[in-house]
């Protein structure tokens, strides 16, 4: 006999997911409040019956579709069977989930079911946003009597293609526990609500790019012809056209409390731009991508500074990465450095075309300032102190630039199926005696940052116009989950 959780349309499935999730969250919050106020423990029998659990989303396909689509990078089945995952924050992910479900529902005739899972929601994820006020003395008791985050149950095995299919196949790369873990970390690291993140992401490794982004973003909000309606800033600042002296409101020190502060230029349709200052180093680059990936962004681009390795380069020239020498080491255990990281044609073309358009250099002239080639990413900020070994490795790789983040970001995009690209600006030439000094740095920054950032923004405009074509099949594994 059918119940209200089976044979659903995509819209019905989303409504049911939201209903079940809200039931569990409300029950967990009420139980925590009762424990804090009265010392009442949660009912163990009710917990066994699913009082605090995530909802589960399942999609089944019998393999009968005569001509399944083969050109899409997502929304495809590799074999018949039942695909399932747990879901958190279904209202936040509604547009994404609806798009994915519509593809398999209409193209494959898949059957959709929603029910309660067996995985409980950890209590820390429901406290934020509630009226609950806790102190440190309550933490031990809550951890003892309520569901908590168990790291053994959180991982990237599905995304890394390491899962072993049993009765059910994974429907998506990240289950609810992994998503909730990252959503909490994103707010902590960036200082902004996860609801404000936009699908087109720029990473930078210098604060001055932030200043330029904020200046340009404020001008866009005031422009009635611009699609951008608000700027969300690290530290909880929300800027609209009605905000008086917006740049002054943003210039306080609230963002300095956060390790990798973010700024979100928001559009009405949720297709805006997020800028994250990841500061310096591959560890930060890995960390932010680990967590940002659960939001399923459409693209992330590295727009930062690098050391130029070729004599023919000049300070202020651009480097478009076509390949990476991964000396960052932070991903070696999950993605060995001998695995090639392919460039994404759509992203490369957008960055190249954007450079031509913004710089105003026609045709072949752009090649005088734009060099394509291999970028080295190192985890050693003082690699210059091992000049002999470094120079030999650079020479063998034919590298044209060095930084500490780009290859990590590209490798994470490869792992998590997020289209990626790198356009760097040469700030010094350490192999050729042009090192970065304070006075030179200031003059360089003043002249280069605005143009470089505008190239990144223009590239996003071009990529946004690509739509679903932006997502590449070359990032799919052999047994890829159906959802993007």
Language model: regions and residue ranges:
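Accessory terminal and edge-of-domain segments that mediate assembly/interaction
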Residues: 1-299, 307-484
């Amino acid at each position: 006999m059918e119940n209200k959780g089976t044979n659903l349309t995509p819209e019905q499935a989303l409504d049911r997911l939201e209903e079940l999730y809200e039931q569990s969250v409300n029950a967990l919050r009420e139980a925590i409040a009762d424990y804090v106020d009265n010392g009442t423990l949660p009912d163990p029998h009710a917990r066994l019956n699913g009082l605090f659990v995530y909802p589960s989303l399942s999609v089944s396909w019998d393999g009968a579709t005569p001509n399944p689509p083969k050109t899409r990078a997502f929304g495809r089945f590799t074999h018949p069977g039942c695909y399932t995952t747990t879901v958190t924050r279904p209202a936040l992910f509604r547009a994404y989930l609806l798009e994915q479900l519509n593809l398999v529902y209409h193209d494959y005739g898949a059957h959709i079911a929603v029910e309660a899972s067996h995985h409980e929601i950890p209590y820390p994820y429901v406290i934020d946003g509630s009226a609950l006020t806790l102190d440190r003395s309550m933490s031990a008791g809550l951890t003892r009597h309520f569901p908590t985050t168990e790291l053994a149950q959180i991982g990237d095995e599905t995304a890394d293609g390491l899962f072993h299919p049993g009765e059910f196949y994974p429907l998506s790369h990240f289950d609810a526990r992994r998503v909730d873990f990252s959503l909490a970390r994103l707010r902590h690291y960036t200082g902004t609500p996860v609801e404000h993140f936009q699908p087109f992401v720029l990473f930078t490794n210098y604060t001055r790019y932030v200043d330029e982004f904020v200046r340009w973003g404020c001008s866009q909000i005031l422009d009635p012809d611009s699609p951008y309606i608000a700027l969300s800033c690290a530290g909880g600042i929300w800027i609209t056209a009605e905000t008086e002296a917006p740049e002054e409101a943003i210039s306080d020190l609230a963002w300095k409390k956060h390790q990798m502060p973010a700024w979100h230029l928001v559009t009405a349709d949720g297709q805006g731009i997020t800028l994250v200052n990841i500061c310096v180093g591959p560890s930060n680059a890995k960390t932010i991508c680990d967590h940002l990936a659960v939001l399923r962004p459409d693209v992330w681009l590295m727009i930062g500074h690098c050391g130029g390795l070729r004599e023919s380069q000049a300070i202020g020239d651009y480097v478009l990465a076509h390949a990476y020498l991964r000396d960052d080491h932070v991903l070696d255990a999950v993605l060995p450095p001998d695995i090639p990281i392919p460039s994404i044609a759509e992203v490369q073309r957008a960055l190249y075309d954007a450079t031509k358009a913004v710089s105003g250099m026609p045709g072949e002239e752009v090649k005088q300032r734009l060099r394509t080639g291999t970028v080295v990413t190192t985890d050693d900020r003082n690699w210059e102190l091992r000049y002999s070994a470094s120079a030999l490795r650079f020479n063998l790789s034919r590298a044209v630039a060095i930084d500490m983040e780009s290859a990590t970001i590209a490798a994470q995009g490869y792992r998590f199926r997020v289209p990626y690209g790198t356009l760097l600006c040469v700030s010094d030439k350490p192999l050729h005696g042009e090192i970065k000094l304070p006075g030179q740095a200031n003059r360089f920054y003043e002249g280069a940052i605005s143009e470089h950032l505008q190239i990144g923004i223009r590239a996003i405009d071009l990529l946004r116009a690509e739509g679903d074509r932006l997502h590449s099949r070359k990032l799919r594994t052999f047994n890829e989950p159906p959802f993007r």
